[in-house]
Regions:
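Extracytoplasmic
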Residues: 73, 182-185, 229-232, 366-556
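Membrane-interface transmembrane helices that cradle and orient dolichyl/undecaprenyl
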Residues: 150-168, 201-202, 279-307, 346-349
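Membrane-interface alpha helices of multi-pass inner-membrane proteins
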Residues: 131-133, 166-181, 187-192, 219-220, ...
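Transmembrane-helix signature of polytopic, membrane-embedded enzymes
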Residues: 110-133, 161-168
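Hydrophobic/aromatic-rich transmembrane helices and adjacent perimembrane loops
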Residues: 185, 319, 325-368, 384-389
Length: 559
């Protein structure tokens, strides 16, 4: 079965596929453009990205997710960063290499898939540039790379779905699951849809057999992870706090109602353009399904591998939109760009190839949606400012200066100036230097609230197996006792309490708070702009080897 459309009534021009060489060349070019864009527009990793770097740092200290520290479901996120740091060191450029490479993979596969579906290099170029320009947040790289590869697998494999390919779909679903569990759910939904729809015309026996292969392969491939989790905390003990954490995180960002266009401000202002993109992203997969059904009903199309692939990507898109499209939309929309780009390319290809009485209408509608979406992306993603940052629209010589500045910054392990991830880190810079001088590399820190950047920039592991001590994050009596057991077995000279969140910490984790009160003394108060500051504590009874000359604080290593 060939991956092509069947035509009727003379409404479309004959299909001409771009050559494989042209697709490969353009896909490689897209990946290089992506790397250049991500590097030139780099403005530091935000605080959320440091969650995964803190986990990676823990792994380099010999700890493993679940066994030694709590993990809500991101083991491969830590592992990829840990592997890169183990091979190439702690420089910021190492993590940027990981991120840029993943986004480059996403762009290349998006281009390859879009060119296959649209039969047009021009359309594939447009949607891929849209994806690049949206500049998803750095820690969201799996949302681009994984879904682009999945879409490509659906489209290319649909016409010949062998047992080996079904097993590979299951394996890829497991990989996605281990990056973040919901990725496995969304990609798994699309994969199962592909298996069903690509086997639909091969008879019930073949259909049931292929579903069995997919589900069986999933079970077998997930078994080692499931046994590992069951051995250390139990599957119920693993999923229950993880789901509570995810539910609490989603509670503050879930869309309570469909976003509305506002007419009290600029009609084409950012708020309205965010709403426009939201409805474009939500509408595209349903538009694809309706278009497929209508073409089948009109006899313009028969069920083919392309039908199965487009439907599978649509199922994946609908599922991921439910999970990804939350508030704030400006930050969340880029996460869902891949299926929108791929499916949008298919719709554009149909419109641009159309001939006959309704061709002008199809062209006009597609041109309007394309132009409106392009402008929305420019505004929502602040593309003009990003171009200035990169030195592309700046004064002559700005790009050269930008490259020279990045070369210095990215060679260091510590971010500087405007690349610092948080006010806490900026305030704690002298403390980081003190920790480096006066504690051992194997010592740990406790930090209340969620400030994973503190552990990475201090180059010290988090204590108690928790990078955050905050409400809804592993706060049950069992979780607190497990954290205390780990704390007692570790060397933890310092505790940092974020006073702005102190009341929440005391209420949510009384056992941990009591332990800190019993075993630690106040050391210093670090002022943080617009907050109550950070209270530093030092372990009571720990014998110093001397006094730090710069701070007057106890030093616990001989110098």
């Amino acid at each position: 079965m060939s991956l092509s459309l069947e035509h009727g009534h003379g409404v479309e021009t004959p299909e001409v596929y771009p050559s494989p060489a042209a697709i490969l060349t353009a896909a490689l070019a897209a990946s290089l453009i992506t790397v250049a864009w991500r590097v030139l527009t780099f403005s530091g990793f935000n605080n959320d990205h440091y969650i995964y770097l803190a986990g990676a740092q823990a792994m380099l200290l010999g700890e493993w997710p679940v066994r030694d520290f709590v993990d809500p479901g991101w083991p491969l996120m830590y592992t990829v960063s840990a592997a890169a740091r183990a091979m190439f060191g702690r420089a910021l450029g190492v993590e940027l290499m990981v991120v840029s490479s993943a986004f480059a993979i996403g762009a290349a596969f998006t281009f390859a898939t879009a060119s296959r579906l649209s039969k047009s290099l021009v359309i594939a170029t447009i949607v891929t540039l849209f994806e690049i320009a949206m500049s998803p947040r750095s820690f969201g790289y799996p949302k681009i790379a994984l879904y682009a590869v999945a879409a490509w697998m659906f489209v290319v494999w649909a016409d010949h779905l062998t047992t080996r390919r079904i097993v590979m779909l299951a394996a890829f679903t497991v990989v996605a699951f281990l990056f973040r569990h919901d990725h496995g759910l969304y990609i798994g939904a699309g994969s199962l849809a592909l298996v069903v729809l690509a086997s639909w015309q091969d008879g019930l026996k073949v259909l049931v057999l292929r579903i069995g292969v997919f589900v069986g392969a999933l079970a077998v491939l997930l078994m080692p992870w499931a046994l590992y989790v069951q051995h250390y905390v139990g599957l119920v003990g693993y999923f229950q706090p993880g789901l509570e954490f995810s539910r609490a995180e989603a509670e503050g960002t879930v869309l309570r109602a469909l976003p509305r266009f506002g007419f009290g401000g600029p009609l084409f202002g950012q708020a309205n353009l965010e709403v426009w993109l939201f409805y474009v992203f939500e509408t595209i997969p349903f538009a694809c399904l309706v278009t497929l059904w209508f073409r089948l009903w009109r006899g313009q199309h028969r069920w083919s591998a392309e039908s199965a692939a487009v439907t599978a990507v649509s199922v994946m898109a609908i599922a991921m939109n439910l999970g990804f499209l939350r508030t704030p939309l400006a930050a969340r929309l880029p996460d869902a760009v891949v299926p929108a780009a791929v499916l949008g390319s298919w719709l554009l290809g149909l419109a641009w190839r159309r001939r006959g009485s309704r061709a002008r209408l199809a062209w006009a509608v597609s041109a309007f949606v394309l132009a409106s979406s392009a402008w929305a992306i420019v505004v929502v993603a602040d593309v003009r400012n990003e171009l200035n940052t990169a030195g592309i629209l700046n004064r002559p010589g700005a790009m050269k200066e930008r490259i020279a500045d990045l070369r210095v910054r990215l060679s260091k392990p510590m971010p500087e100036r405007d690349h610092l991830p948080s006010r806490n880190s900026q305030a704690l810079m002298p403390f980081y230097a003190y920790v480096d001088r006066c504690s051992a590399p194997t010592d740990r820190l406790v930090m209340t609230g969620l400030s994973p950047d503190v552990f990475v920039l201090a180059n010290r592991g988090f204590a108690g197996g928790q990078m955050a001590f905050r409400p809804s994050f592993y706060t049950s009596p069992t979780d607190q006792q497990r954290a205390l057991t780990r704390l007692r077995a570790q060397s933890v000279p310092f505790v940092i309490v974020a006073l702005e969140e102190e009341a929440d910490f005391l209420r949510a984790m009384p056992a941990i708070a009591s332990y800190v009160d019993t075993h630690y003394d106040k050391l210093a108060l670090v002022p943080v702009p617009d907050t109550r500051g950070l209270q530093l504590y030092v372990e009571r009874g720990r014998h110093p080897a001397g006094v730090d000359g710069a701070t007057g604080w106890p030093c616990f290593v001989a110098r």
